């Protein structure tokens, strides 16, 4: 079994990385790169000839998670969507956060550009304590392209398997509101 993928059918991140490291890792024409804490990018797997379309397809979502384990009532919460390649948002965007106490949903709105391979969406936590918030399968309403391209549209569909956050920046796949 290969330790990483480098084709349009398998753009999998290096398997030896932690979940937190994977959230900072993305494919470029040089190979797999990781964003270091100082803000620089480091090639961790060098792969040649990745610029052709048969190697790097449109960026796909690899992780979706809340950036905290809980939010105080009325606080600003954040959902982070991570792609497997660098991306460039082209329009504002939204996604839906589901509440456990009602059938109502909360709209999270894109907050800036995020990072090289992720976008943050902010929302206001409900004013009721003990409400569990989750992220379900959905399509993000937003314009986004692969980095450096104006013609390759990146994936905007969140699958249930994309919602994962094990040990990512203290994040979680569901959160509970607290007082």
Report residues per predicted region.
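Non-catalytic beta-sheet/beta-sandwich ligand-binding modules that flank or precede catalytic cores
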Residues: 1-179
